Amino acid sequence: HGIGRRQRQMCIRDRVLGHESTGVVTEVGSAVTHVAPGDMVMVTWVPRNIESETQPPAAAQLQVSDGVAVSQNVFTWADHTIADQQYVVKVDPNIDTDVTAIIGCAVMTGAGAVINTAKVQKGESVAIFGVGGVGLSAVVGAKMVGAHPIIAVDLDDEKLAFAKQFGATHGVNAANEDPVAAIHALTVREVEFNFSQQPVSGADYTCDCIGIRQTMEQIV
C-alpha cells in the first residue's frame, strides 16, 4: 500500500511482473551448477542463501518492441523467463505444479512469518487475520511448530472451515462477532493475572494477512 511514497519504491516503466512460479529449465549459464536443463524448478523473489553471493543481482532487463522492460528481480508472467540462479530452486517433479507455484511467495511469507520471524514455540497461541493463500500458509506453519490455539479470523465461513483442514483449531467470523473479544475468550490464562487481578488473555502472536487499517487496529 505504500508503493511510491519513497523514492526507492518508485516503479520504472515498462515493467514485467510476476514473482513466483514453477517451470522447467530449458537452458543454463556456464556458472550455474545447482540446476540443469530438464529440471523442475521454482522461481521466487527471495534469493537463495549463498555465502559467496551476499548481494542480490541486478534487475533483469528485456529488449521489447518499443523499448526496454525491467523487472524488480524476477518476472514470471510469461511463457519463458530469465532469472539469476539465486532466485531458482530445484523442486520435486512429482509434486503438482499448482502446489509448488505458490511456494515462492505465499507459502514463504505466511509460514516464514510464523516459523522464522516470530519463532513461535510449541503451546503458544497464534491468531491469523485473513486465511487466503498467505494466511493458510501461516496456519500450516503454526501447526508445524505445535502452536495452540490456532485461531483463524476471516469474513467467509467457507474459508474458515477450509482453514481448519489446514490446522486451525478455531474459526472466528469477524462479520458476526468481535474478533478481539473472541480471541481473548479463547486465550485466557487462568494462572496469570494482570494488575486488576483478572486472568491474562490474548494471543501470543498475531499475523495480519490482510493489511488494512481495521485489522491492524484490532491486532494492536
Model-derived segments and spans:
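Short, flexible surface segments
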Residues: 34-37, 109, 122
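Adenosine-nucleotide cofactor-binding segment
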Residues: 128-131, 143-218
